[in-house]
Amino acid sequence: SVAGRVGFAYRIPYAATKWAVIGMVKSLAIELGPRGIRANALLPGIVEGERQNRVIEAKAKVKKVSFEVMRDEILSGASLNRFVTHQDLAEQAHFLCSPLGKNISGQAISVCGNIEKAG
């Protein structure tokens, strides 16, 4: 999760575990690299889908705004102004596992639309 790179208000334990995953991946890359094994982490931002729609609906209800207004507010934190899709994540994973990614190891790769804050 991108929460391993940015702050996540009211979700400190979650964010802390995501920072830990980055350290784990970097350590695994050092340990396993001599055997030709690569380790990387994908850090998704806000992933489009039903789960995210429920989160947006709940936040909209609390703030007494429409779904669309809440969605736009959430997306305003990402410079690309769009959600990540499952396909985006799959394509990045495929690239990393392909011969094109053969020299990429120990990296925490954000797939997040340049989101500046989580939550």
Spans of features found by a protein language model:
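Residue(s) in the substrate-gating loop at a strand-loop-helix junction
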Residues: 1
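Short C-terminal tail/terminal secondary-structure segment
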Residues: 5-6, 93-94, 100, 105-119
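Active-site loop immediately N-terminal to the catalytic Tyr-X3-Lys motif
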Residues: 6-13, 34-35, 81, 99
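Active-site helix of classical SDR
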Residues: 17, 25
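Short, small/polar-rich loop/turn modules that mediate ligand/substrate recognition or access, typified
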Residues: 33, 38, 104-106
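Conserved SDR Rossmann-fold cofactor-binding beta-strand/turn motif
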Residues: 38-48, 97, 110-112
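Short, flexible catalytic-loop segment of classical short-chain dehydrogenase/reductase
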Residues: 43-54, 58, 62
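A conserved structural motif in NAD(P)-dependent oxidoreductases
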Residues: 66, 78-89
